A protein has these predicted regions:
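Active-site-surrounding "flap" and adjacent substrate/cofactor-binding loops of secreted or lumenal enzymes
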Residues: 182-186, 190-265
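Feature responds to low-complexity, polar/acidic, surface-exposed segments characteristic
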Residues: 2-9, 14-75, 83-103, 111-137, ...
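Intrinsically disordered, low-complexity linker/terminal regions across diverse proteins
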Residues: 587-590, 594-901
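Short, glycine/acidic-rich hinge or "gate" loops at secondary-structure transitions
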Residues: 205, 254-257, 367-379, 394-398, ...
Length: 901
């Protein structure tokens, strides 16, 4: 069969390479790099696969010189020693730094392969004159499998020292023999077979390499999780150094802000009469309001002085008619009443408990309320949550994801049951998938006068101008139907209920200043909200989450201890970096740890490299549009204009606004610095609405996250520093390899400008139909082609993904990878590098249950093996490089290969 022929051809080529490699070493012996025992053992263990072996620290410790092993090799040598691959010398030493004879290396390789069924004989064993009797069986096995050919003179150079180059050739051949997936069967599985064998999993597994599925356990792995773990480890180490005074930093840096805020958080319960008086004064403004006008005035004054709006959620939203950023406005949800009432089962299970918690909190404040007023406050919370239905669904999904992380007993049946119950109660959720391709609904925009006319007893224009918004002529409702539903909320009859909700909102918005008793009750309220979306009992959720956070802190301590085993973490450091303190820091300053990472680990030269790649990809898109054979000239020019106007922010934003955090030594406190943070949040929203460039220069998420995104309403892309790590971006890799990975990501994000959703926005990010009627009709047909094309690829045998849900991501994937190959041109080696780096980037292992779960199958992204295999089948070079023939599962006839632009 053709597939076997491909494997034999590959093996023969590698064998030939080994034979030929002997001669250069004869003439350049002084340049030969010989391999040490620790290097050889580690390479062989990785070739066979770490997941096939189990290590034991105890067994390794029985060798007297185990402490001489380099840290990077310890884990692999532990596994090799436990499996008997390396057995040491009679004097109980391993001699890890010594060079290794070829015969010794070959025997270790044979031992690695003892429990592997994938190494099969392809020829008769070769008889070598210099192989000792004790090694004959092992060498016969290797030579029969075509892994050892010797020097061609009847010897194998048994006593010669093995070189690094020869070790690499042996591992390459072993990898080829162990790779049970052919490129014509699953390119994703073919490229990532070795990665799957070496993924960092906790126990031995059975892996379906074709799909990247674990059959026997629930661990998961991907390069993205590896990068996340590496970034997190670096951040934890920085935090320990920072707190212990071992990190130098400048005033105004993320390190300075984090350090001084942590010191304030750590001393949050220190007595400060001035802070207490100020904190209570804002609370008194609420409780002492006797009329609705006084209440609104109090809310506005608090907003002006603290940046906290107790009635409204104010954000920056684009005006779809003008492209300008305007204040987005909706009533604040004021608590958990909305999400509890969204689910009848949650209402039944948590409704009364929630109201009782509010009552208990008010009693602690010394502001008792009747049951009827609390009931009215709850009803107002329901009303003010109008328009948040989709947000609640997202919260449920993220809640269940959180549960899967913190709850060892989590099972997917529980998750599916919760989501199915929601869908049954809210059938409109079934239509969500159609929103990925539906025409965006026209946006409602209100003049200030129109907004004031909807809601009684509030002057929205004055409220905004008083805090610094200027030249505001209109506002954008950020939640559909929200303002209209709340038109009668601000009435005298609701005054007490509004004050209850405002007190609750105040406590939740600024915990600084609250007593421990107040905080404990607020935490119960927060845990109840989390219980709703995770399906856990509130106490159980609190217990699991606390344990998870403590483990994160312990990981930080372990990282620091590993840096120098003679040092221990200072008890004060452990206290300052406690789970509670770190959670509060993250809540208050969600971007600062990401900026801390960038300050110490982001290579500034990367920005220019990635920007050049962005420019190259934009040029490739423009050429595609110029040469497009189905778009009218007018539509082509509109598309080209849009590409030219795409802006990019790379790594992190240098324009992001941050608060001045005042050190404790200069009078800074937990409360006053928290107010500075809240005021800065407001300042950022004002800047987004008032400075036309600012919104394009900032990022909407922390730069350490492994992500990139396109914003259709801004027509810009952001490539975050967290994703600019190997193997997604490797500064030492070739341009072609990086194009296949981070280049494909960039091209994907630009592709979103022209997917089923992004294509509805023009070059200014305005919702505007720039298509001719005929072109729009063809574009719709193209979308159906994507649905049909992706339906042929399986997530796992017998299971396909809903390609209607994933259509926008699939369109961006295909358009992106095809632009990448336009840039590469006809260079076969570069094409091969790009294809394999693309597949490598998306390597992921998940359980077969996870891969086929309803949650994943409804993800807007195709599962990783589908997005790789579907994309590469659209590239003609793929078929030529890997000899993909008709009849192979990966084969698609030329006329059926997907093409968008």
């Amino acid at each position: 069969m053709k597939n076997k022929g491909f494997k034999r051809l590959t093996s023969a080529a590698i064998v030939l390479a080994l034979i030929l490699s002997v001669f250069p070493s004869v003439f350049a012996a002084d340049q030969t790099e010989f391999a040490t025992r620790e290097y050889v053992v580690s390479e062989f263990v990785q070739s066979v696969g770490r997941n096939n072996l189990t290590g034991s620290d105890y067994i390794l410790s029985t060798f007297s010189d185990s402490d001489q092993i380099d840290e990077e090799y310890v884990g692999d040598i532990s596994k090799a020693a436990t499996a008997g691959i390396v057995r040491g010398y009679e004097d109980k030493t391993l001699r890890p730094k010594e060079n290794v004879q070829r015969i010794e290396a070959m025997v270790m390789l044979a031992r690695c392969l003892e429990n592997t069924d994938d190494i099969q004989p392809v020829q008769d064993p070769i008889v070598f004159a210099d192989v000792p009797d004790w090694a004959v069986d092992d060498i016969n096995k290797l030579s029969a499998a075509g892994l050892v050919e010797g020097y061609g003179d009847g010897t194998m150079g048994a006593e010669d020292s093995i070189t690094v180059e020869q070790v690499k050739l042996l591992t390459d051949r072993s990898d080829a023999a162990l790779n049970t997936v052919e490129p014509g069967e699953s390119f994703y599985g073919y490229v990532n077979n070795k990665a799957f064998r070496n993924a960092d999993l906790s126990s031995s597994t059975t892996i379906d390499a074709k799909h990247g599925a674990i059959i026997t356990q629930e661990n998961a792995w991907s390069h993205f999780t590896d990068i996340y773990n590496d970034v997190t480890e670096k951040e934890n180490d920085l935090l320990v150094q920072l707190v212990e005074g071992d990190l130098e930093y400048e005033q105004g840096s993320a390190a300075q802000r984090i350090y001084d805020m942590l010191m304030c958080i750590d001393g949050k319960f220190e007595d400060n009469p001035d802070d207490t008086e100020l904190f209570e004064s804002y609370r008194s403004m609420i409780t002492e309001a006797d009329t609705i006008d006084e209440f609104v005035e109090a809310v506005n004054n608090i907003y002006k002085e603290t940046g906290i709006n107790l009635l409204f959620s104010i954000s920056a939203v684009q005006n779809s008619e003008t492209g300008k950023m305007e204040p987005g406005i909706a009533f604040a949800s004021m608590g958990s009443g909305g999400i509890i009432s969204y689910s009848s089962s949650a209402t039944e299970q948590y409704g009364e408990e929630y109201k009782n918690l509010i009552k208990e909190y008010l009693d602690i404040l010394g502001y008792p309320a009747s049951d009827s007023e609390i009931e009215k406050a709850y009803e107002i919370q329901e009303t003010t949550s109008t328009g948040m239905e989709l947000i609640y669904v997202v919260q449920y999904v993220y809640g269940l994801m959180t549960r899967s992380i913190i709850d060892p007993d989590f099972d997917e049946e529980t998750s599916d049951a919760i989501l199915e119950s929601l869908i049954e109660e809210h059938p409109e959720l079934n239509a969500l998938e159609e929103q990925t391709t539906a025409t965006a609904a026209p946006q409602e925009i209100y003049s200030i006068e129109e907004a004031n006319a909807i809601i009684d007893n509030i002057d929205i224009g004055s409220m905004l101008s008083d805090v610094g918004f200027y030249n505001i002529e209109s506002v954008v409702p950020s939640l559909t139907g929200n303002l209209e539903a709340c038109e009668d909320v601000l009435t005298e009859s609701n005054l007490e209920a509004l004050k209850i909700n405002a007190l609750l909102q105040y406590g939740l918005s600024i915990k600084a200043g609250s007593t421990q008793e107040e905080l404990d009750k607020l935490n119960e309220l927060v845990n109840l909200n989390s219980a709703v979306v995770t399906g856990l009992d509130p106490d159980r959720y609190a217990e699991l989450y606390a344990a998870f956070m403590e483990q994160q802190v312990q990981d930080a301590s372990d990282t620091a201890e590993e840096t120098d085993e003679t040092e221990t973490i200072d008890p004060d450091t452990e206290r300052i970096l406690s789970a509670e303190n770190m959670q509060e820091l993250q809540n208050l300053m969600p971007m600062d740890i990401g900026y801390l990472y960038c300050e110490y680990y982001y290579d500034e030269s990367t920005t220019a490299v990635i920007q050049q790649m962005v420019d190259d990809i934009k040029a490739a898109y423009i050429e595609r549009f110029k040469n497009n054979d189905w778009m009218a000239d007018e539509t082509k020019q509109n598309a080209i204009n849009k590409v030219n106007k795409i802006r990019s922010t790379i790594g992190y934003s240098k324009e992001q606004l941050f608060p001045d955090i005042i050190p404790v030594s200069e009078g800074g406190t937990y409360f006053t610095n928290t107010l500075r943070i809240k005021q800065n949040d407001l300042r950022s929203v004002i800047a987004q609405c008032g400075d036309e460039d600012y919104i394009y220069d900032i990022m909407l998420m922390s730069p350490d996250i492994q992500n990139a995104y396109y914003n259709p309403s801004l027509n810009n892309i952001c490539i975050l520093a967290g994703i600019l790590n190997a193997p997604i971006y490797d500064k030492d890799a070739s341009y072609a390899a990086n194009l296949g990975a981070i280049g494909a990501v960039i091209a994907h994000e630009i592709g979103h400008a022209f997917d089923a959703n992004g294509a509805q926005y023009d070059e200014n990010g305005v919702l505007n139909n720039w298509w001719t009627e005929e072109d729009a009709a063809i574009f719709q047909e193209k979308q159906q082609e994507f649905v049909d094309y992706y339906s042929r690829f399986e997530v796992i045998d017998g299971v396909t993904q809903d390609s209607l849900v994933t259509i926008t991501e699939n369109m961006a994937d295909v358009a992106g990878i095809q632009c990448v190959f336009d840039i590469i041109g006809d260079d076969r080696e570069a094409q091969k590098e790009a294809l394999e780096s693309f597949a490598t980037m998306w390597a992921q292992i998940g359980t077969s249950n996870y891969l086929t779960s309803e949650q994943l199958l409804q993800d807007v992204h195709s599962s990783n093996q589908v997005r790789v295999n579907a994309c590469v089948t659209t590239i003609d070079a793929f078929y030529e490089i890997y000899d993909i023939q008709e009849g192979d599962p990966m084969y698609v006839s030329p006329e059926d290969r997907l093409k968008l632009w």
